[in-house]
A protein has these predicted regions:
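Short hydrophobic clusters on alpha-helical segments that form packing/core surfaces
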Residues: 10-18, 88, 131, 154
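Hydrophobic alpha-helical connector segments
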Residues: 54, 67-96, 137, 147-150
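Helix-turn-helix
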Residues: 9, 13, 17-54
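Hydrophobic/aromatic-rich alpha-helical bundle segments in the mid-to-C-terminal region
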Residues: 115-121, 136-195
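Amphipathic alpha-helical segments used for helix-helix packing
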Residues: 92-118
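Short, basic, alpha-helical segments at the C-terminal edge of helix-turn-helix-like DNA-binding modules
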Residues: 57-64
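Short, solvent-exposed amphipathic helices
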Residues: 69, 115-126, 130-133
Length: 195
């Protein structure tokens, strides 16, 4: 049986509590949830701000893996892009969806220079970069703008799911598909049928 280190417990507790309760949760509650003393926390992290940033960064790869199709997925770019929105629908349908942790944190912090906001921006850029790479593969005319628009649809769908406290009903997938259609980005099957 492996025992997690105090640092790992703090990062895990911080990730859960900051996303569920907000970044203004007290250090006492955070340390209690992690089973770590405040003294230990401040020996491991210079500040709560550093802990916010590191907890976001540590969760990034697993959050991306939930959303992005893997490199072994060889479907057309359009299908790979729409997979992100389908997986978002699945996360929302689980019933405990609290929105995108990166957008939520950045909105709550209200300071673009805060270390947590910097990390949030970095991971949101990963999503935009994923869309951009796929759009380039698909031969989209303006992949930069289209990638930003897809990211906005993703973030808007996340916000809608939280505000309305209900499933998205596929609206993110439908909206992204309509945008891709308007840009002429089709899967190979659709392109063959249209040609």
């Amino acid at each position: 049986m492996t025992t997690s280190t105090p640092r790992e417990r703090l990062l895990e507790a911080a990730g859960e509590l900051f996303h569920r309760d907000g970044v203004n949760i007290g250090v006492d509650a955070l340390c209690k949830a992690a089973g770590v003393s405040k003294k230990s926390m401040y020996q491991l992290f210079r500040s709560k701000d550093e802990l916010i940033a590191e907890s976001l960064a540590s969760r990034g790869p697993s959050y991306q893996a939930l959303l992005h199709p893997g490199p072994e997925d060889e479907r057309p770019a359009r299908d790979r892009i729409l997979t992100v929105f389908e997986r978002q629908d699945e996360l929302v349908a689980q019933g405990d969806f609290l929105g995108c942790p990166y957008v939520s944190t950045a909105v709550e912090l209200k300071n673009p220079e805060h270390p947590g906001s910097v990390v949030a921006r970095h991971f949101k850029q990963h999503l935009t970069d994923f869309f951009h790479r796929e759009l380039v593969k698909a031969g989209a005319e303006d992949p930069g703008t289209l990638a930003i628009q897809l990211t906005m649809i993703f973030d808007g769908a996340s916000a809608r799911a939280v505000v309305r406290a209900q499933d998205l009903g596929g609206i993110g997938v439908l909206t992204a598909a309509a945008l891709l259609d308007a840009a002429g980005v089709r899967s190979s099957e659709l392109a063959t049928q249209a040609g």
